From Swiss-Prot:
Organism: Xenopus laevis (African clawed frog)
Region (Disordered): 1-21
GO MF annotation list: G protein-coupled receptor binding; G-protein beta/gamma-subunit complex binding; GTP binding; GTPase activity; metal ion binding
Organism ancestry: Eukaryota, Metazoa, Chordata, Craniata, Vertebrata
Residues annotated for GTP binding in this entry: 36-43, 171-177, 196-200, 265-268, 322
Self-association state and partner proteins as the record states: G proteins are composed of 3 units; alpha, beta and gamma. The alpha chain contains the guanine nucleotide binding site.
Coiled-coil stretches: none
Region (G5 motif): 320-325
Full protein name: Guanine nucleotide-binding protein G(t) subunit alpha
Length: 350
């Protein structure tokens, strides 16, 4: 009888210990939801978490991105060539018209994600054409990946035999996120579970079941989207869509007590773009200087003023460049400190 009781007590103690360990783990688990409109840079932030907190990409993993990189490069050139027609731009050299036809034919016949020499030669010749460059300069008037210039300028390196993508090549690669992707990592004695949710309109209905128990939302908006339209609706300005989405999330009853951090992303692209395209394209009331600081601060204010609970809920904002590992590391460190501070406040310790 005594032996049975002590076995029960032992089991009970073990169970209590396990429950306490689970409770401690739950208390240290941070559930992060990455939200934002399509192509704002959410998936790039996830890749950075792998680089910063999970030992990065192995050579084998980098090699798996070759097909995506080649696919992105080809699709970018096809998009530019098609836009030449739409925007009525002529090739600098009439011989490139024939290259453009060959490119379209080859694209239909090659294996997806491959880059035969004939194709890379054609893409290289097209990229040097003055008409193609003029069309590239008007990229906000059609849909073109942000990485287009990066890959096309580096095409010779990408097609060298034995090519292994660099971390920067991997970060710049683009695959539309469908569904929900979870990444786990540890930092400052916390267990992070980060959820990247597809941003395009058709994906948003999948968000709802991620809402419960979220510690922090990182909302990502592309600063450079101010003169662009949506992939899924060419009547809607991307910045307006992002503001509309942020409004619905930041004032949602689900998130009344959730920390919200705003990443105003693609500051590198924005820096170059703001020199050429005035912010009044997106915000007709804006008559301030068309500089990175002034225009950037104006955009930030448009987001922060949507917060209807400003008196009790602070929204933290950062200008970010998701492809810059040091910048993301610095900003994410600050976000982690915010999460720790908010958690201590909830426990009455701050």
């Amino acid at each position: 009888m005594g032996a049975g009781a002590s076995a029960e007590e032992k089991h009970s103690r073990e169970l209590e210990k396990k429950l306490k360990e689970d409770a401690d783990k739950d208390a240290r688990t941070v559930k992060l939801l990455l939200l934002g409109a399509g192509e704002s840079g959410k998936s790039t932030i996830v890749k950075q978490m792998k680089i910063i907190h999970q030992d990065g990409y192995s050579v084998e993993e980098c090699l798996e991105f070759i097909a995506i990189i080649y696919g992105n490069t080809l699709q970018s050139m096809i998009a530019i060539v098609k836009a030449m027609n739409t925007l009525n731009i002529q090739f600098g050299d009439p011989a490139r018209q024939d290259d453009a036809r060959k490119l379209m034919h080859l694209a239909d016949t090659i294996d997806e994600g491959s880059m035969p020499k004939e194709m890379s030669d054609i893409i290289g010749r097209l990229w040097k054409d003055t008409g193609i460059q003029a069309c590239f300069d008007r990229a906000s008037e059609y849909q073109l990946n942000d990485s287009a210039g990066y890959y096309l300028n580096d095409l010779d390196r990408l097609v060298i035999p034995g090519y292994v993508p660099t971390e920067q090549d991997v970060l710049r690669s683009r695959v539309k996120t469908t569904g929900i992707i979870e990444t786990q990592f540890g930092l400052k004695d916390l267990n992070f579970r980060m959820f990247d949710v597809g941003g395009q309109r058709s994906e948003r209905k999948k968000w709802i079941h991620c809402f419960e128990g979220v510690t922090c939302i990182i909302f990502i908006a592309a600063l450079s989207a101010y003169d662009m339209v949506l992939v899924e609706d060419d009547e809607v300005n991307r910045m307006h869509e992002s503001l509309h989405l942020f409004n619905s999330i930041c004032n949602h009853r689900y998130f009344a007590t959730t920390s919200i951090v705003l990443f105003l992303n693609k500051k590198d692209v924005f820096t170059e773009k703001i020199k050429k395209a005035h912010l009044s394209i997106c915000f007709p009331d804006y008559d301030g200087p068309n500089t990175y600081e002034d225009a950037g601060n104006y955009i930030k204010t448009q987001f922060l003023e949507l917060n209807m609970r400003r008196d009790v809920k602070e929204i933290y904002s950062h200008m970010t460049c998701a492809t810059d590992t040091e910048n993301v590391k610095f900003v994410f460190d600050a976000v982690t400190d915010i999460i720790i501070k908010e958690n201590l406040k909830d426990c009455g310790l701050f």
